[in-house]
Amino acid sequence: MRTLWILAVLLVGVEGHLLQFETMIIKMTKQTGLFSYSFYGCYCGWGGHGRPQDPTDRCCFVHDCCYGKVTNCDPKAAAYSYTIENGGIVCGGDDPCKKQICECDRAAAMCFRDNLDTYNYAKYWKFSAKDCQEESDPC
């Protein structure tokens, strides 16, 4: 069980209700976030700095910015509700905090899906931190 928790912590974005975000990614891309998006580019995975390297890395940058704007709750722990409808994700529930987190995760999962054609595992997975030194874009 401890191994599963450690793996969950490594998921893309590192925050939010990780298993829900992972499920969103799988449903939208048919790829697992853990193996396809953690350690990708300069922003996918733990932390982030520099300039996003491609559209997928930009999805992670925008996701990080989105979490930074979440107010009055902890994006690392709040479980939210959502459904998959007509190939998209619909966030539900009445809690504004949880809905904000869900919307951040929804946007990232949809962004990953929309950029599968430029996703470059060979080039950007385990991308070197020394290549992420340029000044970051503002959120």
UniProtKB/Swiss-Prot annotation:
InterPro entries: PLipase_A2 (IPR001211), PLipase_A2_Asp_AS (IPR033112), PLipase_A2_dom (IPR016090), PLipase_A2_dom_sf (IPR036444), PLipase_A2_His_AS (IPR033113). It catalyses: a 1,2-diacyl-sn-glycero-3-phosphocholine + H2O = a 1-acyl-sn-glycero-3-phosphocholine + a fatty acid + H(+). GO terms for cellular component: extracellular region. It comes from the Eukaryota. It is found in: Secreted. One of its GO terms (molecular function) is calcium-dependent phospholipase A2 activity. Disulfide bonds join C42-C132, C44-C60, C59-C111, C65-C139, C66-C104, C73-C97, C91-C102. The keyword Mitochondrion does not apply. Its cofactor is Ca(2+). GO terms for biological process: arachidonate secretion; lipid catabolic process; negative regulation of T cell proliferation; phospholipid metabolic process. Binds 1 Ca(2+) ion. Coiled coil: none annotated. Keywords: Calcium, Disulfide bond, Hydrolase, Lipid degradation, Lipid metabolism, Metal-binding, Secreted, Signal, Toxin. Residues 1-16 form the signal peptide. Ca(2+) binds at Y43, G45, G47, D64. Expressed by the venom gland. It holds the Pfam family Phospholip_A2_1. The active site is at H63, D105. Its EC number is 3.1.1.4. PANTHER family: PHOSPHOLIPASE A2 FAMILY MEMBER, PHOSPHOLIPASE A2, MEMBRANE ASSOCIATED. Belongs to the phospholipase A2 family. Group II subfamily. D49 sub-subfamily. PLA2 catalyzes the calcium-dependent hydrolysis of the 2-acyl groups in 3-sn-phosphoglycerides. This is Acidic phospholipase A2 Ts-A4.
